[in-house]
Amino acid sequence: MAQQEVYLGNPNLKKANVSQNFTKKQVAEYLKCAENPIYFIQKYIKIVSLDEGIIPFKMYDFQESMVEKFHKHRFNIAKLPRQSGKSTIVTAYLLWYVLFNDNVNVAILANKAPTAREMLGRLQLSYENLPRWLQQGILGWNKGSLELENGSKILASSTSASAVRGMSFNVIFLDEFAFVPNHIADQFFSSVYPTISSGKNTKVIIISTPHGMNMFYKLWHDAERGQNEYVPTEVCLLYTSDAADDVRG
């Protein structure tokens, strides 16, 4: 890629307003990716392995099922153990979402801001390893946010009402929500949640390892009993060392 076509000197990133020529095969492939997030993730998402470096992300069956649910349903809640790839699969879906949907805003919110920024970093690494013809041009790129030329944006922050107050989001991802203090979780849901839940196509994805009696516990058990609009997913797996969290997220 010519220097004048890259974003801030990064040869892996295309800057905005750079024309892109497509072959017929690339057009067909682009349309296939836009239609099917599972296909896109299976074929084009790469992650970092401590032992092997950058490798293709090979999804387990339960991860494919999660992507199907994210795509089909507006409200998802998942209870998963550590080392299950829970954050990696969500960020892979969110990357697909902002690439192939114009003018959408996504929030990655975690119990700690550095955790949210680390997840955005994983997404950004996957983005840098996409073929140029699958990329959108970059308007903004830092540790806390990402902005694409199609108008779509991602914000990474801690789970708090103040972090996202005054902003509208099409997708909110709440990571390790069981570890958010009760008073913060209550404040978040009372002030921010109504904005997104009132939309027709907005999505909420809540994922956590269980951690006591709290809002996540209530939302989960209400979902199990069909008493709220969340689609529940529970994964109980023991992984061998080759599927450790540092590989699958």
Task: Show the residue positions of the predicted features.
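Phosphate/NTP-binding elements of NTP-utilizing enzymes
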Residues: A2-S241, R248
